[in-house]
Amino acid sequence: MDNPTDTAGKCPVAHGNKPRGPSNRDWWPNQLNVQILHHNSGRADPMGKDFDYAEEFKKLDLDALKKDLTALMTDSQDWWPADFGHYGGLFIRMAWHSAGTYRITDGRGGAGQGQQRFAPLNSWPDNANLDKARRLLWPIKQKYGNRISWADLLILTGNVALESMGFKTFGFAGGRADVWEPEELYWGPEGTWLGDERYSGERQLAEPLGAVQMGLIYVNPEGPGGNPDPLASARDIRETFARMAMNDEETVALIAGGHTFGKTHGAGDPSFIGAEPEGGAIEDQGLGWKSSFGSGVGKDAITAGLEVTWSQTPTKWSNYFFENLFAYEWELTKSPAGAHQWQAKNAEASIPDAYEAGKKHLPTMLTSDLALRFDPIYEKISRRFLENPDQFADAFARAWFKLTHRDMGPKVRYLGPEVPAEDLIWQDVIPAVDHPLVGDKDIAELKAKVLATGLSVQELVSTAWASASTFRGSDKRGGANGARIRLAPQKDWDANQPAQLAKVLGVLEGLQKDFNAAQTGGKKISLADMIVLAGAAGVEKAAAAGGTTVSVPFTPGRMDASEAQTDAHSFAALEPRIDGFRNYVNDKRLQFMKPEEALVDRAQLLTLTGPEMTVLVGGLRVLKAGQPEHGVFTARPETLTNDFFVNLLDMATQWVPAAGKDGVYEGRDRKTGAAKWTGTRVDLIFGSHSQLRAFAEVYGQADAKEKFVKDFVAAWNKVMNADRFDLV
């Protein structure tokens, strides 16, 4: 994969949009950013609120589109000629880099929104000249219009590129709806392209980051920091691919499969390259990296500064990557641009030139390629693939499908005729509903039975919240559907209070078993539904205790996943380090955010707005959900009231840091000094941060009691149903 070094040292922050004064973030750089809760809210969407992409996709003639894409592969354009007469390598890189930003730590990145069109990704050094790939696609996107999103088109084009060169892919699913503004995502602390201040200690990569340098997708192909050491490169590869949820076999298959096609570009010194798209002149119309070296294109193209072609047939699927990797000894050399790369010793020139027929070159490799030979674990896998090409092809097909679909969530979101029938464990499989569901009468009776068990409001609400709040809108993982809270690892997470959780689940499983046994006609309720229903019963009881009658919506249809359908290792990434909604901090885990930052981060993953986050925190506090030691600003715990906001905003209370307790504060009577409450940074941020205080004041008003309950129930229901893609 190309990744240019020509922009090293340049600041990735845009300047020059004047007249412009300092922003609030310029004045107060440590101010909590709640604006991320309101990005892509719809105001920037030109399609309107009634546009249904899934319905538009159903109108798509996929065969006709793929035929047009196949024709494009060999329709070389003078303004950006195709290497070897085929754009396949370019489009594979485009699709790979669209998906390859995915990181398992928080589920962000990936291909699901078409973010490669926007800054900063469209101007990352590692994405150099992919603007040309997207411009080549524009006539096709223009032709098919709303029936295919950019997000889907980028991935489909990668698939068609592979198929047009003789590779059998595993499948393709549509369903990635475009967004219309860049997401504000933490890509690293560096202020310059290719900076690597993200490391500490013995090359410890900071979380949640998944790449080694600012502006790269994974690793530096020249080696760590440009050091051409294959074993050191292997360590970086293993770390970065693991953070994208890939194991060693998938990693080897992806690198070798991707590098079976195309070439890198390093015809001349990177100093010949102009600005990236976001920094270019207006007349360049969003095309960047204009080169003044020779013609600037084709044989004169500069992208990564590396000049490597891996295969004797770079437009055809083969096993040449592994054959070449093990056939030769390799000596370090430099590209015409001065980048470290490797050349085969005592070899014949067998690699075709991309533009001059009959011209041949010596086999070449990247430092990151040699890692697959010299790392002992990778070497074992690589030799197996060398000797078993069918295994390699199958592994690459599966790994490519995983790479390009990892952030799409459950299969119910997949669209189109090429969706594979096989269930894959990384898809977090949930069984299809195979029985009649409970009706309104059943729901009312079950709620009454739940309340008759003696389980407290706190226990019911905490369990339902723990089950549902794992949802991540980023990669559509987690949530209450599947009832995986009863399975490892979730049942043992400290944030879920395992002893209490086991007690509550035991009671609810008993009710579920008794109900199902008493039914005729096959009607059942799943434990996943039972957990959410019990939480609804708890909220209703708490609201009634506060003088408000409310019916919490409940829609059955969740199912229970099995251990065999659950990748426990993969689910470990969903464990909360900090959960501001539950006032929980795991002191045993390394934290990379302040508690209040983690609250907003979690709210964004739950797709909540600022007001929704605010009302949920206030409600969960008085219901004693989660860790009830702090923030319960009420004399009526387990009663759904707006007391949290009333008491937080009370000027009769003065807040001071608690002695010997970092991040904990005491609320004291301003006159007497008597202790009244204890709270955390997450609690106090709703009185400190001006925008959050404005939300809190709405719910702390004398006329807000009913609004508070109504809004809490609506936000609660949103979280409980966040993963119910079957309802969309």
Swiss-Prot record:
InterPro entries: Catalase_peroxidase, Haem_peroxidase, Haem_peroxidase_sf, Peroxidases_AS, Peroxidases_heam-ligand_BS. Binds 1 heme b (iron(II)-protoporphyrin IX) group per dimer. One of its GO terms (molecular function) is catalase activity. It catalyses: H2O2 + AH2 = A + 2 H2O; 2 H2O2 = O2 + 2 H2O. Keywords: Heme, Hydrogen peroxide, Iron, Metal-binding, Oxidoreductase, Peroxidase, Plasmid. Pfam families: peroxidase (PF00141). Heme b binds at residue 259. Formation of the three residue Trp-Tyr-Met cross-link is important for the catalase, but not the peroxidase activity of the enzyme. There is a cross-link at residues 96-218 (Tryptophyl-tyrosyl-methioninium (Trp-Tyr) (with M-244)). It is an enzyme of class 1 (oxidoreductase). Gene3D superfamilies: 1.10.520.10, Peroxidase, domain 2 (1.10.420.10). Residues 1-26 are annotated as: Disordered. The active site is at 97 (proton acceptor). One of its GO terms (biological process) is cellular response to hydrogen peroxide. Its cofactor is heme b. The record marks 93 as: Transition state stabilizer. The keyword Repeat does not apply. Belongs to the peroxidase family. Peroxidase/catalase subfamily. Homodimer or homotetramer. NCBIfam families: cat_per_HPI (TIGR00198), PRK15061.1 (NF011635). PANTHER family: CATALASE-PEROXIDASE, HYDROPEROXIDASE I, BIFUNCTIONAL CATALASE-PEROXIDASE. This is Catalase-peroxidase. It comes from Rhizobium etli (strain CIAT 652).
